[in-house]
């Protein structure tokens, strides 16, 4: 569902797929090739949200910020299932694991991996090319080239999968065509 709220309207610049059960409201910009999956909520009612090119916001993720805050997701980012991004910035090619939480003002660098279930506290900076895990999240190592390549592959795989879902035929329609 796309909706205007607080005088702000989402801008779709060519998303590959936005699920019919996703909610995209307010000051949200969807860049070309991005995908927003089932049950995801992207609320740009309090501040602007930009979803980068080929970035995927997976099922049941929530993106929102406090008044005056903003969210910027770079190109080729993966926001895992059930993750929460609240007023944060995520750099190009990074992966935020399932059920991870990013709090206000934190910055995740380029080509980073945030482990599943991690909590990145307010204002924390995760340097480029690192892996951070835990509660609170701490950097444990440099991201191996294979890990960052896999994160990039994941982003492209979700663009392609999104196109498949966008072309899907609902079962009721398929049955009536028989």
PLM features: what roles do these ranges have?
Residues 1-12, 17, 45-48, 53, ...:
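Glycine-rich hexapeptide-repeat left-handed beta-helix
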Residues 20, 32, 53:
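A cytosolic small-molecule/anion-sensing beta-strand core signal
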Residues 25-31:
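N-terminal glycine-rich anion-binding loops that anchor highly charged ligand groups
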